Amino acid sequence: MNEQIPHDKSLDNSLTLLKEGYLFIKNRTERYNSDLFQARLLGKNFICMTGAEAAKVFYDTDRFQRQNALPKRVQKSLFGVNAIQGMDGSAHIHRKMLFLSLMTPPHQKRLAELMTEEWKAAVTRWEKADEVVLFEEAKEILCRVACYWAGVPLKETEVKERADDFIDMVDAFGAVGPRHWKGRRARPRAEEWIEVMIEDARAGLLKTTSGTALHEMAFHTQEDGSQLDSRMAAIELINVLRPIVAISYFLVFSALALHEHPKYKEWLRSGNSREREMFVQEVRRYYPFGPFLGALVKKDFVWNNCEFKKGTSVLLDLYGTNHDPRLWDHPDEFRPERFAEREENLFDMIPQGGGHAEKGHRCPGEGITIEVMKASLDFLVHQIEYDVPEQSLHYSLARMPSLPESGFVMSGIRRKS
């Protein structure tokens, strides 16, 4: 037992976590006036922590490991079994370089261009519709774009099914019951679909282009010179495609931010890429996306009067850190201007994780997320006019991942002249 830090007295907090969602850690760090506390989750003792200093410690690879940290239920829905998110050391860096090679600025630019093309093509159909649900449209467009960019053949008739499978994997993360099992069923379907392509590419039955995600995953060699087995290559290719489709959550929150804070429409119209970047960053900070991340203590150490024993499970609060008043002035206000003079910090703005993408566990696709969001924001602000009919735009911080209940319905869509 760790006597130096607060202990949550509940026998097990698993159900409470599902009830409180994004606020589970934040509620307790505020209650105990402490950046860390101990609680029982899933029948085990966890240390939960928040803040930039905690993030700095959490991303110290000498102190923490990811191997064996992810519950099987998360591997079997969201990430895939034994994928990059659970690797450490030189093997992790070697695999990470593969992902980073696919997410360079030219790749980011290409994806943003493809998004713009797809958005513009969608308007013709939207103009004839009474209304459209932005989330449904965004996930299919992102799926189409991600597969095309990655070199993954995708028939138009299967776009909806594949997009739904990717989103179901994401939606299963914070769920029990039907939502979780929907994601569990989606994963093997997607893995089998992609594995056939990996095998066909290796057999020369499917032509691939060097530099595309399909080609690079199919022919990647590990540190020992061997190729990934075809199922693992499929899992890692899904770890490229699925997060791109998941940007649809951020795109809906961007539209919600424009609706709830209409003064920024004019601000964006009279601005340029810099204003778009600030707006996008504030959407990523303010609205809920990843709630927390887990790791295991690699070796005994003491931090902040707390003993971290080898093998202890630790959760880092992403949402709470992004809303920490010590790091953010009026954190519960939506204010893109806060990024005008803000210096970059690897540990205070962590919607997709913290630290270095190259050497650590920060999401390698963060640049893609930002560029796709900027291109989509530009489309919403400069390319179309639309109405927002009465609907439930409420989103619950108890639901992980969260999304406005209506998916953001738009009506009367027309091209700007």
Swiss-Prot record:
Keywords: Heme, Iron, Metal-binding, Monooxygenase, Oxidoreductase. GO terms for molecular function: heme binding; iron ion binding; monooxygenase activity; oxidoreductase activity, acting on paired donors, with incorporation or reduction of molecular oxygen. Heme binds at residue 363. Disulfide bonds: none annotated. Its cofactor is heme. It is an enzyme of class 1 (oxidoreductase). It catalyses: a 1,2-saturated fatty acid + H2O2 = a 2-hydroxy fatty acid + H2O; a 2,3-saturated fatty acid + H2O2 = a 3-hydroxy fatty acid + H2O; tetradecanoate + H2O2 = (3R)-hydroxytetradecanoate + H2O; tetradecanoate + H2O2 = (2R)-hydroxytetradecanoate + H2O. This is Fatty-acid peroxygenase. It comes from Bacillus subtilis (strain 168).
